[in-house]
Amino acid sequence: MNMSIGRMLALVGGVAVAMATTAAQQSELLIRNGLIVTAEGRVEADLRIRGEQVAEIGPNLQAGAGARIIDARGMLVVPGGVDPHTHLVPELPNPPRPNANQDDYASGSRGALAGGVTTVSNFIPLQDQPASAYADRVAGDIEKSSIADVFVHVTIGNDPTRFTQPTTLRDLVARGFSSTGEDFLANLSFDRNALGFYKAFKASGAAGILSMMHCEDASIIADSKETMVAEGRGSLHNIGLSAPTVAEVVAVQRVVAIAEATGAPVYILHTSSARALHVAEEAMSRGLPVYVETRPVYLHLTEDVYLRPDVGLYVGTPLLRQKRDQDALWEGIAKGTVHTIGSDHTAFSKEAKLDPTQTVANFRAGFNNLQDYRPMLYSEGVAKARITVEQFVSVTATNPAKIFGLYPRKGTIQVGSDADVVIWDPTVKKTIRDQDELSNARYSTYSGWELTGLPRTTIRRGEIVFDSGKVIGKPGTGKFIPQQGWQRPRLPHTSS
């Protein structure tokens, strides 16, 4: 269509005026006098949020007309957390199932936001749907009831055939899905179709998809459990003997070999032992695309808790290990070889976790800790000088955002990023109590622990959703967050 220069300028001018008007109408939030901390460093500055994004960072910013001002003097201003490993139910069944996961997007969000986590993940099976229908279903469920933002890992299941098909993989990436998991080497079905899974990981890597691996050798564990039960040693108190460290080590070695042979990126879920971490570190030193997650419980608890009467509360897989393993994981965070902390939140009820009929061969694995994992890491890590606050931000926000293709929209505080911000009180003290938990499970893995440092205010995309102990965000305001196709990230505090 032909158009005069004057007409074109008039339209451009009209667009500029409209954009200016829209910007002027956006709500403004000005956070003053805080210490802004990112993975790269810290600065005393003001932070302007306009609409859903960070608009300006600098000293002595002037408030716009109608701006809400928050005085963050004495506070840390950190990015909202990104939990790369969360298990939520899109919709709870009616009637409820007492022995199943009790948290949906709404209840899981409440705990997350209270703990300073603004973006969670979930694992959803592809089933027989095309990528477009899958994406619509996933986004619809999230945006119907979530308060936190959510990204999704595609679950492969026992049949990897579809994940060897380039068209399926390209369609998934195009719709914002660039990670698969949880791929269970711990299941005997993996070994029965090892070639199929190998081809799926190879094809996924070529398509820009990261494979997330649960690393335990199924045969070692199955034989161990069978032997213990047959010998009358099946009590849950003996569970620490049922899945030895070598089962994790062998599986990590296997996953590293897959990464080396195919070039595909791999993400090792909930690494629990020093020996498994050392295998991954050796792979990183050779430049392989290997990423390590650990789970909060491995940093705070050891296998000694299996002697407690309430042993069921502390059972998950891989199992808890020894003090030397705990120390190695803390060291890995400090030197950058443990890249992320994933809560692996699975909210069984306390009654289900304490079911006395459980044995080493039949138990409910999972921890209710989405609300507490970030405060626990700050209290036990930063407040006790094990790690810096920058490293805290790295493993709980920046690194997961980078690894899973959400950065720089998520995981940082910079102009143009989503305004996911937590005002963190570094000195406030609190005792964790079951009655304060916002999860439907209504208990905490860390009940009775003393915390130093807590979120005071949580802001998700420019909206205050948690403040002074109360969640005020509404279900249905969370968004599905599409991932970018996997590209090798540059991570702070690490050479990978």
Regions found by a protein language model. Give the residues of each.
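Histidine-rich, glycine-flanked metal-binding segment
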Residues: 26-29, 36-80, 96
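C-terminal cap of metal-dependent C-N hydrolases
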Residues: 34, 355-359, 415-480
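Divalent metal-coordination and catalytic microenvironments
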Residues: 34, 47, 52, 74, ...
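Metal-associated gating/positioning segment near the N- to mid-region
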Residues: 72-145
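Alpha-helix-loop-beta-strand connector modules within alpha/beta enzyme cores
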Residues: 78, 133-149, 153, 199-213
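Histidine/acidic residue-rich metal-binding segments in metalloenzymes
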Residues: 164-341
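His/Asp/Glu-enriched, well-ordered alpha-helical/loop segment
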Residues: 233-263, 312-314, 334-335, 339-341, ...
